[in-house]
């Protein structure tokens, strides 16, 4: 079990079943199977889904801030500001994704056309930090979802409840269940996650953990 404690009081506020190798593999396989259909959705559809997620954050700031403060210990005002500020970043991604991934010609001749086009990576791991989970996580999973990827989201064990809340809001907003999956646990869960045949890994955390991730995924030339 993963025990979540309030760092200000030491009180236990939740006990959660941790993922294991079997459940991580199952979540990966489900994400892999679901991702092509998500990528096939027209971009405006995915934009609408993430816009609903932004609206859900905006309408639930107080409750979400209370959860964030209870498990990280940051002042409630800072938690509110983080959630409110993250909606501005989401707006940026909503407004800029279409132009960023648009196919563009770089050379055209009588018998040749060269162009740059973009495709989703596929299934990506998002290993996030505890101190600003809405900023740090959202900087990865929002553009990843907008561009047609499936996300296996491993929040810090010190911000797990917030990670679960993010997952619930995304699913209620229209992100399919297996396109965004939350993994529960500490460093061992992250280590097991990156052993899966994922297509990319995005990490924010300590230098030592970053080195371990690089040693695991570097030979596979992951993004």
What are these regions (language model features)?
Residues 90, 163-166, 193, 213:
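Hydrophobic packing residues within well-ordered alpha-helices of enzyme cores
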Residues 123, 174-223:
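Conserved NAD(P)+-binding/catalytic subdomain of aldehyde/semialdehyde dehydrogenases
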Residues 17, 127, 152-156, 183, ...:
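Active-site-adjacent beta-strand anchor residues
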Residues 1-112:
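N-terminal Rossmann-like NAD(P)+-binding subdomain of aldehyde/semialdehyde dehydrogenases
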Residues 105-177:
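Conserved small-residue-rich beta-alpha loop and adjacent elements
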Residues 16-25, 173-183:
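Histidine- and aromatic-rich ligand-binding microenvironments
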Residues 22, 59, 63, 74, ...:
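Short alpha-helical
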Residues 31-34, 144, 163, 217:
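Small-residue (primarily alanine) positions within well-ordered alpha-helices
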